[in-house]
Amino acid sequence: MNKYVISLGLIISSAASFASEPGPAAPDQPPAVKKPFPHIAWRSDDGQSSLDIGGALRVNYRDEHWDTTENNGRFLFDTFRLDVQATHKQLFSDVGYWFQDDGKRSIDRGYVGYRFNTNSNVQLGAPFKPFGLEPYPQFGWSYHIPFFMGYGVSAGTGLKYSYKDKDWDLQLGYFPRMLPSGIRYSPEVGRYSDLDDNAVAFTQSRQDNEKRNQVNARVARTFTGDGWKTEIGASLAAAELYNATTRDDGDYWAGGVHAIVNAGNWTVTSQAIRYEYDPENPDGVSNDSVLMGGNGLTPAYLIASKATIGSINVGYDIFTPSLGQLKKIKVYNDYSRMMKDKSGWDDSQMFTVGAQFLAMPIMAWVDFTWAKNANPFGGAENGTGWTNTNSVGSNDWYYRTNINIGYYF
């Protein structure tokens, strides 16, 4: 009976069936590159102060191959993003503000910082939480499993210290609270009362957990040789998991290892993540899953409380000096897998093959993605994909074509 109640609740929510996703930002351009209109850049005469205002305007084409979707070959507005960066002597700031589809807004990062020297600084506000591959856990436009579990482009309100030289990269963070759900760019564990505008009451209304007092640590070492460079790193995160119903604190922790290998035109990135949530739920609420959500751009969803995630991404750069404005094409394969602890909850998998075209200020991604037991793929048909795989489309592979075109300034 529970299976059919869950399915009914998810079908009700299918109107929002993951039609949108945040999508990654553009790669950083060298400071010497003059950015196009309407980019604003100002430097003081003494070089002690600066202001840069840039951003992007993007549209998205999506063709999804499952019954409940409305995106059967549709061009839609994706985002208008503003990036504001400023410096004054040792002080600096960085804010990314997104105007997204369906009238949503989000902040992917927003902080002020103080630079102690060329190697170390501290950031206060909403910096990225240091963990694993940074900032994006894949090459393609289509986010993969680590992102949906909260391990990619994830900011929190707090403080971060960073030290980086040619060999070492050390980051330490403390985040008393997560970003408010209404402006989250990336998903995070949340209470139903904060996510109820885009959640399913049948299955999620008693979910009342949120993370508090999270600490993060990430350390990476870079090794270089003749024509190659490799980064190897490890990450840890831990937090209280406060339940507003019981007023008790559960626990959360995660650990990960990652590697980035560059050799010629090839880049290979990989990571393994182990996470565990131990909630203090009231009687009658299962501890096997917790609720996650963002700003409502996609529906809130349950994830397995304990799981292991693995991913590997392979990219190859093709430089095109004879093709005019088109300077580079990156082709890539992204693969990720989520292995849940609970018996009978089958693995979730995602696989993307695609290409990124850099003809700045125009940039485009073309992604072909297959996914199994992954909520964004299949919508209500696959709505329990991150947990018990009891939806109509569980253990079926779903396919999506996505083309994103943006003007970056």
Predicted regions and their residues:
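Sequence/structural signature of outer-membrane beta-barrel proteins
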Residues: 60-66, 98-102, 131-133, 138, ...
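Transmembrane beta-strands of outer-membrane beta-barrel proteins
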Residues: 51-57, 93, 122-124, 170-172, ...
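Solvent-exposed loop segments that connect transmembrane elements
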Residues: 181-206, 244-246, 278-301, 375-395
